[in-house]
Regions:
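N-terminal leader/signal peptides at the extreme start of proteins
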Residues: 1-17, 80-81
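Internal low-complexity, small-residue/proline-rich segments
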Residues: 40-198
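N-terminal single-pass transmembrane signal-anchor helix
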Residues: 12-46, 56
Length: 199
């Protein structure tokens, strides 16, 4: 009968360095495989949120149309000196401001003093500074403020919140003829849903 030495009978406790490195490597590989899946899930959630924003805006436009029998104008403005309609005049609020009540943004809409004061009026500072998430796609990481400048001098006039969703002015270049468009949202437009035949 052979005798086992005391050293042979001791239990081996702990990990070797190689075993520890193998476990760390396996965990690292698993994380590397799971990270893209997590990022894809986040991107899918952002896309879903973006689609939901478009759905809310579309519904608000439909509710506006049901109320006023027309889609909101691209923008309304007049020459402050003459009071006559002028695409480059004031107040200059566009379609996105006009549908605010239909996006459950009544307090903000009421702050605009019924769109009578110009965008640049100090009383509209609070409204101008408000960035609405419904007008932004979550995948956009850019600055959500746009600087309105005087065209002749390039001097900044004010900052305005941006939107990832634009109304279609038409096929004309807005710079060439700001008062005329063949889309849905142009100066003083009164387009009904029934007027839209091609999309």
């Amino acid at each position: 009968m052979s005798r086992m030495s005391w050293r042979d009978r001791t239990l081996r406790l702990g990990f070797t360095l190689i075993e520890l490195l193998a476990v760390i490597t396996i965990i690292g590989i698993m994380i590397a495989l799971l990270l893209p899946a997590v990022q894809q899930t986040r991107e899918a959630a952002r896309r879903t949120s973006c689609k939901n924003n478009l759905k809310q805006i579309g519904l608000a436009l439909q509710l506006y149309h049901d109320t006023w029998q027309t889609l909101p104008p691209g923008w309304l403005a007049r020459d402050p000196a003459t009071g006559r309609a002028d695409p480059e005049g004031e107040p200059g609020w566009g379609w996105a401001a006009r549908i605010l009540p239909f996006l459950e943004q009544d307090p903000l809409f009421n702050q605009l003093v019924h769109l009578e004061l110009p965008i640049t009026d100090p009383q509209n500072d609070w409204a101008r500074a408000t960035v609405l998430s419904v007008y932004l796609c979550p995948t956009d990481s850019h600055n959500h403020q746009w600087v309105l400048e005087d065209e002749s001098t390039g001097v900044p006039i004010t900052e305005l919140p941006t939107s990832n969703y634009a109304g279609v002015f038409g096929t004309f270049d807005i710079e060439d003829n700001p008062g005329r468009g063949d889309g849905v949202f142009f100066f003083q437009s009164r387009v009904r849903v029934a007027d839209i035949h091609d999309g």
